[in-house]
From Swiss-Prot:
SUPFAM superfamilies: P-loop containing nucleoside triphosphate hydrolases, TrmE connector domain. One of its GO terms (cellular component) is cytosol. This is tRNA modification GTPase MnmE. Belongs to the TRAFAC class TrmE-Era-EngA-EngB-Septin-like GTPase superfamily. TrmE GTPase family. InterPro entries: G_TrmE, GTP-bd, GTP-bd_TrmE_N, GTPase_MnmE, MnmE_dom2, MnmE_helical, P-loop_NTPase, Small_GTP-bd. Mg(2+) binds at residues 230, 251. The keyword Nucleotidyltransferase does not apply. Binds 1 potassium ion per subunit. Keywords: Cytoplasm, GTP-binding, Hydrolase, Magnesium, Metal-binding, Nucleotide-binding, Potassium, tRNA processing. Homodimer. Heterotetramer of two MnmE and two MnmG subunits. Exhibits a very high intrinsic GTPase hydrolysis rate. Involved in the addition of a carboxymethylaminomethyl (cmnm) group at the wobble position (U34) of certain tRNAs, forming tRNA-cmnm(5)s(2)U34. (6S)-5-formyl-5,6,7,8-tetrahydrofolate binds at residues 24, 81, 120, 452. The keyword GTP-binding applies.
Length: 452
């Protein structure tokens, strides 16, 4: 883990020409460096304009400086932010001057890591910073903001408090080995642990929603050749992304694009049509299509209404899960006769549209949004969306709570019961980072960008 006694500096904005560039410095020498740059004692949390001079006295730029004294800064340390004009050459000259004044280059995520180590953020809030940076939809943004403001930490702390209350009573009996926990006490403690267990299960149930909003809803477009899959992709994306031809088998490989549908991010995947007797190259495309289908969150199964008997290929239909399949009846403008399908009731929903002229797209967007909305679970007033790390820790806590409940009900020794409760607390503590695990922390913050 990087030493906290160093003063670090980095560019906090992306490299490249822009209106502004922002540099950060944080650590014990920050106040001294700020005084040298400003030529006076820095005013806390006030924007101060100054000609930035390097150590040789050369003016590099007219900049704006803001000094945040500890502990009320992002990192919990003295922190300086410098805004320069967005010329990469100027930003690099200022950064090199900060290094010459005693700063060292910050590692990836080191500013946020210091915020965590100095108690400004818990680990789940630090992860929310990364979620906020990468959010690609309103739902992802909302969930990240809730987590950044401590929503997940509060709910986990509520579970921890319940377990601690039970553990305190159990350990009181360990000090008096001649006495057993009375059955009435065991019932009360079991009820408390059942509540803790229920709350942990509620949080775990939000992981599916968390995956969807963080990664985007992988929506795979499937169907027979020439039913309009690529035309639909192009229409949804708003440009000619996929090649469209009257010749079957034009799409040989899958194509992926991201679009916003309401408050959701959708990862659209166009696939090769499922042909009965494909050519060798086309067969390879079909194999890739089936791989994408197996990994889909949502499937848009396309049927062609210009066909007198519109239907899905049997080989495709048997692979579809009705709960995540939306039937899309395309080419409504060319409907040849039968415009109601016998199998419509078995799917999540059905939409009529024309990819060619753009009819029915609002209905399609609405259906996709409704499918995604069903996964959102609010816990109290909070939007919670746990990630895989949180879910794993909660699962370990559940396992320990179940073991504790079994021992509590069977009248096992208080020492054994206390051991399970401590295991549950250890797992729950991992979520907020209250358990010291240096390797885990280093790996997590290494995924952040430099300057954050």
């Amino acid at each position: 883990m990087p030493p906290l006694e160093d003063t670090i500096a980095a560019l906090a904005t992306p490299a490249g020409i822009s209106a502004l560039a922002i540099l950060r410095a944080s650590g014990p020498d920050t106040r001294r460096i700020a005084e040298a740059i400003l030529g006076r004692t820095p005013l806390p949390r006030r924007i101060q304009r100054v000609d930035y001079r390097d150590r040789a006295g050369h003016i590099l730029d007219e900049v704006l400086c803001v000094f945040f004294p500890q502990p009320r800064s992002y990192t919990g340390e003295d922190l300086l932010e410098i805004s320069t004009h967005g010329n990469p050459f100027i930003a690099q000259r200022v950064l090199q001057d900060l290094f010459a004044r005693g700063c060292r280059p910050a590692g990836p995520g080191e500013f946020t890591q210091r915020a965590f180590l100095n108690g400004r953020l818990d680990l789940s809030q630090a992860e929310a910073v990364m979620d906020l940076i990468h959010a690609q939809s309103d739902r992802a943004l909302a969930a990240a903001n809730h987590q950044l403001r401590g929503s997940l930490g509060r709910h986990v702390q509520r579970i921890i408090d319940r377990v601690v209350r039970v553990l305190a009573q159990v350990e009181a009996y360990i000090d008096f080995p001649d006495e057993d926990l009375p059955s009435s006490n065991r019932d009360t403690l079991a009820a408390e642990l059942e509540m803790a267990r229920h709350e942990a299960e509620q949080l775990i149930a939000t992981q599916r929603y968390g995956n969807l909003i963080r990664d985007g809803i992988k929506t795979v477009i499937v169907g027979a050749p020439n039913v309009g899959k690529s035309s639909l992709l192009n229409r949804l994306v708003g440009r000619e992304r996929a090649l469209v031809s009257a010749e079957p088998g034009t799409t040989r490989d899958f194509i992926e694009e991201r679009i916003a549908v309401g408050e959701h991010c959708i990862r659209l995947v166009d696939t090769a049509g499922l042909n009965v007797s494909p050519a060798p190259l086309e067969a390879l495309g079909i194999h890739k299509s089936l791989e994408q289908l197996a990994d889909a969150d949502l499937v848009l199964a396309i049927v062609d209404l210009s066909d007198p008997e519109p239907s899905l290929p049997p080989e495709l239909a048997k692979r579809l899960d009705p709960k995540n399949t939306l039937l899309v009846a395309n080419k409504i403008d060319l409907c040849a006769g039968k415009c109601v399908l016998d199998t419509v009731d078995q799917w999540f929903g059905m939409v009529f549209c024309s990819a060619k002229i753009g009819v029915g797209l609002d209905d399609l967007f609405g259906a996709i949004g409704r499918w995604a909305d069903q996964w959102q679970i609010t816990v109290g007033q909070d939007v919670i969306a746990v990630n895989a790390r949180h879910s794993h820790a909660l699962a370990l806590a559940l396992e320990a709570l179940d073991a504790a409940l079994d021992k509590l009900r069977s009248g096992d020794a208080a020492e054994l019961l206390a051991s399970d409760l401590r295991s549950a607390l250890l797992a729950l503590g991992d979520i907020a980072g209250r358990v010291d695990n240096e390797r885990v922390l280093d790996e997590l913050f290494a995924t952040f960008c430099i300057g954050k």
